[in-house]
């Protein structure tokens, strides 16, 4: 071995040379079992391996391994990106963690955002609560509205856009930044972040990056009113009008869409780089100003404060407020109206502007940001308990069907039998989306199949968002026969359980006995024993439904991301909108 090392192989290790001697196809096969990080680390081991690490064939294989796009689309996407390596980063670090179903508690009819691949992008689409006609769900043109897009840049970087409309019913795009995406993220946050730009230092005549001492106050620590107002200030400033979305394509629906989608992507990349001046620029041009951001002083004044935030002395402000607080406390004591609770409340309220100043002082401007984090969440029957004061979406833990959990996943359906049958007085039926998941009973003696409602297409919420439409004892077969004409269906299984019913008000529904029937074609029917009401469900491919669906205009930007107002009506339906 030593002779081999000192001979023909020179200073190169035998293992390295052996790897280099392998055909590229063999190396690509090996790459399927190696992580992208490990492939990049190969170049640190030996300079001779740099060509292997930069091989397009290896990174094409890595793009396949991510398993978020079919091979045909991966090859199609390559035309707009510098390399498969850059594409692999976008697929693995941006797309894969985000793809899935995201929800919010409000409104009660359902707030479902499905994040799916677009064209060189990730698109968040809100499914509108609606009815479906006699053709059924698969043939229906499902209404949806865009929530956000993340465009893949030429180098694989992520460019964030929030969709929304202004007061004139003009659709706008609001450029922002992707602040961070954790691979196991379960919360998607819309925030404002401070940005510090390079400035010229006259004393030493060179460009320096200003550095702030201390620790920045997180955006989430600001009072809700400041968070809401900052988001409104930024979105109202950086919004860029776009054409009517009904004629726009956000993802391919046919093979002929590639040219149109490439043109739109170029437009979005210019918007992100140049802001409102994008129409007069080329992507190769240099950016001479700071687009898509709001000056800190303007934000400070918009929030009702005077003066230049950079020249304010926080310590003097605190002293003056402490003196005024001491003076007011003395007067209250003299008048006999002193209250410790009021003093504490006053103290907290007076520190809020200082917290805001501390947050804003970390930058020269502010802009939108999207952050995907993993935080500890409690849940009930698979539905996360949410903080309803944060502009956030929560990822549902929808499981793929496996052995013994064959009914897990996303299901859609309507009430009535046979499926799709409508009457003259009711030409459409409310469209329901349910998440089916498995849990153990509280005493641990039974396995339960739970159908959690995440969308309800009625005009007014009849079932609490995130509540169980039915709970099935999956190990307890039912021997009751199907009470209606079978409509040509063969029934394979039936299980006993309970379905939601009127209880103690809207928030606390009761449950009545029922049976879940399973057909050989994969349909599920839950029938309430007393009323004979039938909820018929089928598995859905949301991506395909949305591709052939109808795009409608979004809500104003902040509400479009997360609707924080308690509501039982369909605020997302186009006919209910107000300008």
Curated annotation (Swiss-Prot):
UniProt domain F-box: residue ranges: 16-62
Protein name (Swiss-Prot/TrEMBL): F-box protein At5g39450
PROSITE patterns for this protein: FBOX
Organism: Arabidopsis thaliana
SUPFAM superfamilies linked: F-box domain (SSF81383)
């Amino acid at each position: 071995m030593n002779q081999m090392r000192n001979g023909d192989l020179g200073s190169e290790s035998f293992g390295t040379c052996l790897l280099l001697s392998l055909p590229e196809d063999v190396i690509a096969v090996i790459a399927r079992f190696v992580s992208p990080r490990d492939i990049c680390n190969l170049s640190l081991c030996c300079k001779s391996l740099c060509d292997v690490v930069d091989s397009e064939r290896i990174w094409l294989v890595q793009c396949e391994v991510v398993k978020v796009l079919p091979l045909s689309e991966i090859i199609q996407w390559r035309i707009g990106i510098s390399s498969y390596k850059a594409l692999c980063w976008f697929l693995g670090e941006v797309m894969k963690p985000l793809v899935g179903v995201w929800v919010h508690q409000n409104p009660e009819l359902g707030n479902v955002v499905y994040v799916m691949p677009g064209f060189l992008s990730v698109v968040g689409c809100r499914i509108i609560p609606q009815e479906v006609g006699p053709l059924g769900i698969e043939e229906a043109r499902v209404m949806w509205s865009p929530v956000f897009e993340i465009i893949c840049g030429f180098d694989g970087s992520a460019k964030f856009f929030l969709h929304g409309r202004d007061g004139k019913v003009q659709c706008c795009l609001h450029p922002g930044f992707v602040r961070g995406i954790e691979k196991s993220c379960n919360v998607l946050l819309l925030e404002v972040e401070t940005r510090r730009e390079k400035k010229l230092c006259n004393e030493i005549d060179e460009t320096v990056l200003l550095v702030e001492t201390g620790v920045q106050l997180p955006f989430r620590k600001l009072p809700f009113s400041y968070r809401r107002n900052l988001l409104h200030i930024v979105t109202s400033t950086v919004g860029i009008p776009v054409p009517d979305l009904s004629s726009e394509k956000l993802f391919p629906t046919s093979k002929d869409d590639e040219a149109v989608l490439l043109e739109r992507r170029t437009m979005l990349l210019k918007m992100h780089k140049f802001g409102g001046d994008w129409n007069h620029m080329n992507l190769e041009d240099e950016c001479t100003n700071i687009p898509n951001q709001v000056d800190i002083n303007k934000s400070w004044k918009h929030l009702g404060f005077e003066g230049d935030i950079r020249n304010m002395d926080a310590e003097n402000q605190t002293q003056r407020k402490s003196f005024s607080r001491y003076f007011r406390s003395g007067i209250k004591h003299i008048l006999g109206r002193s209250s410790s609770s009021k003093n504490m409340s006053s103290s907290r309220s007076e520190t809020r502007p200082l917290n805001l100043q501390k947050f804003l002082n970390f930058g020269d401007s502010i802009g939108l940001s999207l952050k995907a984090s993993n935080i500890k969440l409690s849940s009930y029957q698979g539905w996360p308990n949410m903080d309803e004061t944060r502009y956030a979406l929560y990822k549902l833990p929808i499981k793929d069907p496996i052995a013994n959990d064959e009914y897990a996943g996303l299901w859609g359906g309507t009430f009535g039998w046979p499926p799709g049958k409508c009457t003259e007085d009711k030409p459409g039926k409310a469209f329901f989306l349910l998440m089916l998941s498995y849990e153990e009973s509280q005493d641990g003696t039974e396995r339960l199949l739970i159908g959690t409602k995440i969308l309800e297409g009625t005009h007014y919420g009849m079932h609490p968002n995130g509540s169980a439409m039915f709970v099935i004892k999956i190990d307890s077969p039912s021997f009751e026969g199907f009470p209606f004409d079978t409509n040509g269906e063969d029934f394979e299984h039936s299980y006993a359980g309970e379905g939601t019913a009127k209880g103690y008000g809207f928030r606390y529904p009761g449950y009545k006995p029922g049976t879940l029937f399973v057909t050989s074609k994969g349909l599920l029917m839950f029938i309430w024993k007393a009323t004979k009401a039938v909820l018929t469900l089928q598995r859905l491919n949301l991506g395909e439904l949305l591709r052939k669906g109808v795009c409608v205009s979004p809500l104003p930007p902040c509400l479009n991301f997360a609707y924080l107002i308690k509501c039982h009506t369909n605020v997302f339906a186009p006919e209910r909108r107000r300008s």
